[in-house]
Swiss-Prot record:
SUPFAM superfamilies: LDL receptor-like module, Spermadhesin, CUB domain. The gene is mig-13. Disruption phenotype: Abnormal migration of QR neuroblast lineage cells and BDU interneurons. QR neuroblast descendants QR.paa and QR.pap irregularly migrate towards the posterior side of the body axis while QR.ap descendants fail to migrate towards the head and remain in the central body region or migrate towards the tail. Irregular AQR neuron morphology and polarity during migration in larva at the L4 stage. It comes from Caenorhabditis elegans. InterPro entries: CUB_dom (IPR000859), LDL_receptor-like_sf (IPR036055), LDrepeatLR_classA_rpt (IPR002172), LRAD2/Mig-13-like (IPR042333), Sperma_CUB_dom_sf (IPR035914). Its main location: membrane. GO terms for biological process: positive regulation of cell migration. This is Abnormal cell migration protein 13. Keywords: Cell membrane, Cell projection, Disulfide bond, Glycoprotein, Membrane, Receptor, Signal, Transmembrane, Transmembrane helix. Residues 1-20 form the signal peptide. The keyword Transcription regulation does not apply. Interacts with abl-1 (via SH2 and SH3 domains); the interaction is direct. Interacts with sem-5; the interaction is direct. Glycans are attached at residues 63, 145, 161. Residues 182-225 form the LDL-receptor class A domain. It is found in: Cell membrane; Perikaryon; Cell projection, Axon; Cell projection, Dendrite.
């Protein structure tokens, strides 16, 4: 059970389902479709898209000495809204004037046919309409401008001096304002009177001005197929509560198991210094420990004085013949007494003791 819960958690973290991405284009690209052009002969048509300042956005600063013009055209009946997701363009101290590198926005005064590359009027070639915005500096997630009809023209130019700024990443989308407040089939209602194409509601970018198209429940109600789901935010509160309780109980059970295991291992480990045979000892197996002490040494007697010229010698106490009438017991005791008795010197100067000599020799 614990392994299954861990697998679900890892799956919810690592799982990133496919989400619909708008088509990405570049002001200053490497191929012919994204080539920088200085005239109104390049168009991007559709419901929405992403637009980068240059092909190596995020890797290198934008290119210098660029003069690129690009037209955005939506289906007839829709307007265009441009949002800056990331914007980093070098500017002067007064960012309102944007005297150096600048992105200009022009609003067309007439409706353009998205199916035709020929302009509706010849004047559109040289005059895309009034300028409604110019941008530089640094900001994020900001709506730049909204068109009056179905077309906007963007003009991006950079000076030859160079800059370390990253450039910009724009998202443009189409919408229309419903007079009745209702959207037709194939559209998504933003809830504020705006309607957007259902394809735009199923991506991960805000096409509604209020961001209503990023709510997962609204996307699922619109039958969006390719949406990025977060399991922890799309499930019900009861499921989240049960899932959390299961994780907590599993952790408590694991902690209790570890504690019991440690307790069992501690009880089986023998104590240091304890005897392993405490109940099976017998009298035959018992061996007393040797004593941890030694008997005291005998006292040392002082050596005989060198001042005396007398050298002790062994006297023969039995120089004469023994009396035959003495009993064997008397003879034995007399011999023992003579052997260990104290003998005096003839002169009476020094007493010789056999035991003392033996002790000194030891």
């Amino acid at each position: 059970m614990t392994k299954l819960l861990i697998a679900l958690i890892l799956f919810s973290i690592c799982w990133k389902p496919y989400s619909a991405e708008p088509i990405a284009s570049f002001f200053d690209g490497l191929d012919s479709r994204n080539e920088c052009k200085a005239r109104l002969d390049r168009r991007l048509t559709g419901f929405s898209g992403l637009l980068y300042s240059h092909s190596k956005y995020g890797q290198e600063p934008y290119n210098t000495s660029r003069n690129c013009v690009l037209m955005l055209v939506a289906p007839i009946g829709y307007s265009i809204r441009v949002r800056a997701l990331q914007f980093d363009v070098a500017s002067t101290e007064n960012a309102r004037t944007c005297e150096k590198d600048t992105l200009h926005v022009f609003d067309h005064e007439t409706t353009l046919d998205p199916e035709s590359y020929a302009p509706a009027r010849i004047d559109d070639i040289t005059s895309p309409g009034p300028i409604i915005g110019q941008f530089c500096g640094h900001f994020e997630n900001r709506i730049l401008n909204t068109s009056s009809h179905n077309a906007l023209t963007l003009w991006w130019h950079s000076n030859p001096n160079g800059s370390n700024s990253k450039g910009f990443k724009l998202h443009w989308g189409s919408f229309r304002v419903s007079k009745t407040g209702n959207c037709v089939t194939g559209e998504f209602s933003c809830g504020n009177g705006e309607c957007i194409p259902i394809e735009s509601a199923c991506d991960r970018f805000a096409d509604c001005s209020n961001g209503e198209d990023l709510i997962h429940s609204r996307q699922m109600a619109a039958n969006c197929q390719n949406i990025e789901l977060d399991p922890l935010t799309t499930v019900s509160g009861v499921f989240v509560l049960l899932f959390s309780a299961t994780i907590i109980l599993s952790l408590c059970g694991f902690i209790m198991f570890v504690c019991c295991l440690c307790k069992c291992l501690k009880s089986t480990i023998p104590i240091k210094g304890a005897s392993s045979h405490t109940t099976t000892t017998t009298a035959t197996d018992y061996k007393p420990d040797p004593p941890q002490f030694y008997p005291p040494s005998p006292p040392k007697m002082p050596p005989p004085s060198a001042a005396s010229s007398y050298t002790p010698r062994l006297h023969h106490h039995f120089e004469g013949p023994l009396v035959p009438s003495e009993t064997s017991a008397f003879h034995s005791s007399n011999r023992m007494q003579n052997h260990y008795s104290v003998n005096s010197d003839i002169n009476g100067d020094y007493t010789y003791v056999r035991n003392d000599v033996h002790r000194n020799l030891l």
